[in-house]
Design a protein with these regions (language model features):
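Conserved helix-loop functional segments at active or binding sites
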Residues: 181-189
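Conserved small/polar residues in nucleotide/adenosyl-binding loops
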Residues: 191-193
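A glycine-rich, Thr/Ser-enriched phosphate-binding loop motif common to dinucleotide/cofactor-binding enzymes
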Residues: 165-182
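N-terminal ligand-binding/catalytic initiation module
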Residues: 2-164
Length: 193
């Protein structure tokens, strides 16, 4: 049975058209501040931006106050285990990572950016993610083949000071637990009838 049988029917062309309609892809970056005047632009960039830069240099935690860091998640993959498709490579995983980013925005109002790392080397991936981690409030690892996904997650938890969410592991555990809780609720309600 094809996975498409479980959802509303659509053609391959419709799926491709969805991704190319309007601006290609599914995400964009917009300003959270009004940029209507030259003064607004001067505050957003130079020279006004120097003030929060200095504050963050004195206290890195203030980045959560002056930047989007606290509401910004990186969705990261190397494309080695894309959904049910397998290893299609880093760039082929981009539509999935963009899709996860829009889910973060739609259901939790969390800003997210997709990052595709063109490497199968766990140490290289760990190094890359650890070097960019200060930009984000959290990291979501997605569609990275086992056992590398577990190695990457464990090492990153030791190296960085932000949450590391391994979607294929933690997401499955959360969904399974939710299913069990709901099944118990139903079973208990039937017992009490």
């Amino acid at each position: 049975m094809n996975k498409k049988d479980n959802i509303e029917k659509y053609s391959d062309k419709e799926a491709l058209d969805f991704h190319t309609g309007g601006k290609p892809g599914k995400i964009e970056i917009i300003s959270s501040k009004d940029l209507a005047t030259q003064r607004d632009l001067a505050l957003a960039y130079s020279p006004g931006v120097a003030v929060p830069c200095i504050e963050i240099s004195k206290n890195e935690q203030s980045a959560y106050d002056y930047t989007s860091k606290g509401n910004l998640v990186a969705v990261i993959s190397n494309g080695s285990a894309i959904l049910g498709l397998g290893d299609l490579g880093a760039l082929a995983s981009k539509p999935v990572m963009e899709g996860k980013s829009v889910l973060f925005k739609r259901f939790a109002d969390i800003d997210s950016i997709d990052i595709e790392i063109d490497s199968k080397d766990s140490n290289e991936i760990i190094n890359c993610i650890s070097k960019i981690s200060k930009t984000f409030g959290g990291i979501n690892l997605e569609d990275i083949a086992a056992p590398d996904c577990f190695i990457i997650e464990e090492k990153l938890k030791q190296l960085v000071d932000i949450p590391i969410f391994h979607d294929d592991q933690h997401g499955t555990a959360i969904i399974t637990t939710a299913g069990l809780i709901n099944a118990l609720d139903i079973a208990l309600s039937l017992i009490h009838i």
